[in-house]
Swiss-Prot record:
Keywords: Cell cycle, Cell division, Cell projection, Cytoplasm, Cytoskeleton, Golgi apparatus, GTP-binding, Lipoprotein, Membrane, Myristate, Nucleotide-binding, Nucleus, Protein transport, Transport. Belongs to the small GTPase superfamily. Arf family. The gene is arl3. GO terms for cellular component: centrosome; cilium; cytoplasm; cytoplasmic microtubule; Golgi apparatus; Golgi membrane; microtubule cytoskeleton; midbody. SUPFAM superfamilies: P-loop containing nucleoside triphosphate hydrolases. Gene3D superfamilies: P-loop containing nucleotide triphosphate hydrolases. This is ADP-ribosylation factor-like protein 3. It is found in: Golgi apparatus membrane; Cytoplasm, Cytoskeleton, Spindle; Nucleus; Cytoplasm, Cytoskeleton, Microtubule organizing center, Centrosome. InterPro entries: ARL2/3 (IPR044612), P-loop_NTPase (IPR027417), Small_GTP-bd (IPR005225), Small_GTPase_ARF/SAR (IPR006689).
């Protein structure tokens, strides 16, 4: 097989499919983030009652992103979506300091889930465009992220509204999609 035919085969190889679970409290910005990734209009977003799924092509991957509603009454159903998750993206509203404890508890519970064991996690410290937003470093410290040892993780400041930091986070996802620790 010549070099040209090898290159043709590589070029025509289908993108690796990746299942991404997008979670976080209600009003954290998950759906805005998903629409930003899909280059869709973000001017009119309503609370997600069930879930949204979008597929996005990125760096040789077909990212199937599952955006699950974050309202308290929906959270018990999150576990129905854990199976076969390749990457967990957890979105935090950096400007809503009153809910840091609640979001920290939810994240800790997710990290303890057996079906998500070893799954790489990206934490988006969202709404950095707001003056009241806590920096990602402060959130990481407050949530004791440095104690996470059973998986690769990253905290990324972003604004789903402006798009700032979103691509940096997704670059990390694509680099670490195969880093699931057994």
């Amino acid at each position: 097989m010549g070099l040209l035919s090898i290159l043709r085969k590589l070029k025509s190889a289908p993108d690796q499919e990746v299942r991404i679970l997008l979670l976080g409290l209600d009003n954290a910005g998950k759906t805005t983030l998903l629409k930003q990734l899909a280059s869709e209009d973000i001017s009119h977003i309503t609370p997600t009652q069930g879930f949204n799924i979008k597929s996005v092509q990125s760096q040789g991957f077909k990212l199937n992103v599952w955006d699950i509603g974050g309202q308290r009454k929906i959270r018990p159903y999150w576990r129905n979506y854990f199976e076969n998750t390749d990457v967990l993206i957890y979105v935090i509203d950096s400007a809503d300091r009153k809910r840091f404890e609640e979001t920290g508890q939810e994240l800790a519970e997710l990290l303890d889930e057996e079906k998500l064991s070893g799954v790489p996690v990206l934490i988006f410290a969202n709404k950095q465009d707001l003056l009241t937003a806590a920096p990602a470093s402060e959130i990481a410290e407050g949530l004791n992220l440095h104690t996470i040892r059973d998986r690769v993780w990253q905290i990324q400041s972003c604004s789903a509204l402006t798009g700032q930091g979103v691509q940096d986070g997704m670059n990390w996802v694509c680099k670490n999609v195969n880093a699931k620790k057994k």
